[in-house]
Curated annotation (Swiss-Prot):
It comes from Arabidopsis thaliana (Mouse-ear cress). Regulatory subunit of acetohydroxy-acid synthase. Involved in the feed-back inhibition by branched-chain amino acids but not in herbicide tolerance. May play a role in valine and isoleucine-mediated feedback inhibition in roots. In vitro, inhibited by valine, but not leucine or isoleucine. Required for reproductive development and sodium homeostasis. This is Acetolactate synthase small subunit 2, chloroplastic. GO terms for biological process: isoleucine biosynthetic process; L-leucine metabolic process; L-valine biosynthetic process; regulation of catalytic activity; valine metabolic process. It comes from the Eukaryota. The gene is AHASS2. Belongs to the acetolactate synthase small subunit family.
Length: 477
């Protein structure tokens, strides 16, 4: 009670002093204890209101700073990485994504004797992905890294799908195959193996329609892409093709083929560098970026060395590709081909790789890989009958005078034209290595601007027919 009286008297004195100083012209009144308590409660409420408003403003400011902007949205990016091939380069590039927690959705690797092209699909924001691109540029032998998602491009991927097919459902499956422009590559009494190419949306649509029949296995390549050429722009590839532009032959008739090739590859002829495969290379050998004979799988030699095809089923988690390729490279094995894509079960991915070695060494490698935690299944299908396919996108320099010839060659190899401009034609073709090599060799005379190729995907043939045993022998009449 004494404390309350003291506080009241002090408060009254302060109010009286303020009124005298302000000169209101009327005597100050001494408030009673009830009025003082009301004033104190009112000030507390005003202070609480001010604090609440300040907290609200701070919360709004914080929310505005935390709220993501349009450029911070997570989106799917298609990255092209062109490198000089060396031992362990796949593991090093996969490690850059694994250390930053990125999960690679698909990967397509076009390997050559001394160079390689990676087409990688990942999810991430623009800002963080830019940091990953900068880290990739710092790696040794990385020539160029490009995000193709920012410009118009044509993209394709390849899928082999094996599903149950009894006589009662086979007609409906064939109807769906015809709608999606797919192909039957193997058939048996109870199953069918289908090959289809297209964009990822087409793959998902076909898989959804075939799920009711029972999907047994799926092998998908990663997505590959090439930049679309704009109609009406000048031809930047004319020095690559004398056949495509015959009116230029007379102007440069005194130049030898080596001189014209050197002029084009040194960049004096307006060579393009906008695609994901580059037509020039600053080396003295003057070889195209992806040669026709890249990754050629040779038959078994006298020492027992041959190429082995491995099919791995792994968990779809960040870093699993780095784990697999690291286990292979640490043991001194070279990867000739690599294709990574979603498997038939959700949460799993299938890796198809080609590794040269003897049967004994590959068996040891398989036993070592089986010890990995994220590996669900591994199968060496080299000695089994299997259907293998690869996908290639090839951009050829061809104006109106040479376009008909290029399309005739494409028809022989059952290739499809998927993009046409004033000075180029982009073709899509699927098949084995020998078919790819033969087509690329035939088109070199017209000038190959860009090439993108996937690795090999393979599925075991349920029919048991191995076409390799028929080569070199005449078929029965």
């Amino acid at each position: 009670m004494a404390a309350t009286t003291t506080a009241t008297s002090l408060f009254s004195s302060r109010l009286h002093f303020q009124n005298q100083n302000q000169g209101y012209g009327f005597p100050a009144k001494t408030p009673n204890s009830l009025q003082v308590n009301q004033i104190i409660d009112g000030r507390k409420m005003r202070n609480a209101t001010v604090l609440s408003a300040a907290s609200t403003d701070k919360a709004i400011t914080t929310a505005q700073s935390v709220a993501p902007t349009a450029c911070d949205r997570v989106r799917r990016h298609t990255i092209s990485v062109f490198v000089g091939d060396e031992s362990g380069i796949i593991n090093r590039i996969a490690g850059v994504f694994a250390r930053r927690g990125y999960n690679i959705e698909s990967l397509a690797v076009g390997l050559n004797e001394d160079k390689a092209l990676f087409t990688i699909v990942v999810l991430g924001t623009d800002k963080v992905l830019q940091q990953v691109v900068e880290q990739l540029n710092k790696l040794v032998n990385v020539i160029k890294v490009e995000d193709l998602s920012k410009e118009p491009h044509v993209e394709r991927e390849l899928m082999l799908i094996k599903l149950n097919a009894d006589p009662s459902t086979r007609s409906e499956i064939m109807w769906l195959v015809d709608i999606f422009r797919a192909k039957i590559v193997d058939t048996s009494e109870q199953s069918l193996t289908i090959e289809v190419t297209g964009d990822p949306g087409k793959m998902v649509a076909l898989t959804t329609n075939l799920e009711k029949f029972g999907i047994k296995e799926i092998a998908r390549t990663g997505k590959i892409a090439l930049r679309r050429e704009k109609m009406g722009e000048t031809a930047p590839f004319w020095r690559f093709s004398a056949a495509s532009y015959p009116h230029l032959v007379k102007e440069s008739s005194h130049e030898t083929v080596a001189e014209k090739t050197k002029l084009a590859l040194t960049g004096n002829g307006n060579a393009s560098s906008g695609g994901d495969v580059y037509p020039v290379e600053p080396y003295n050998d003057f070889k195209p970026v992806l040669d026709a004979h890249w990754g050629m799988v040779y038959d078994e030699d006298s020492s027992g060395l041959r190429s082995h095809t491995l099919s791995l089923l792994v968990a779809n988690v960040p870093g699993v590709l780095n784990l697999i390729t690291g286990a292979i490279s640490r043991r001194g094995y070279n990867i000739q081909s690599l294709a990574v894509g979603p498997a038939e079960k959700e949460g799993l991915s299938r890796i198809t790789t080609v590794i040269p070695g003897t049967d004994e060494n590959i068996d040891k490698l398989v036993r070592q890989l089986q010890k990995l935690i994220d590996l669900q299944e591994i199968q060496n299908i080299t000695h089994m009958p299997f259907a293998e396919r690869e996908l290639m996108l090839i951009k050829v320099a061809a104006d109106t005078s040479a376009r008909r010839d290029v399309l005739d060659i494409a028809q022989v190899f059952r290739a499809k034209a998927i993009d046409v401009s004033d000075h180029t034609i982009t073709l899509e073709v699927t098949g084995d290595l020998r078919k790819m090599s033969a087509l690329q060799t035939q088109l070199e005379a017209y000038g190959i601007c860009e090439v993108a190729r996937t690795g090999r995907v393979a599925l075991v043939r349920e029919s048991g027919v191995d076409s390799t045993y028929l080569r070199g022998y005449s078929l029965p009449l």
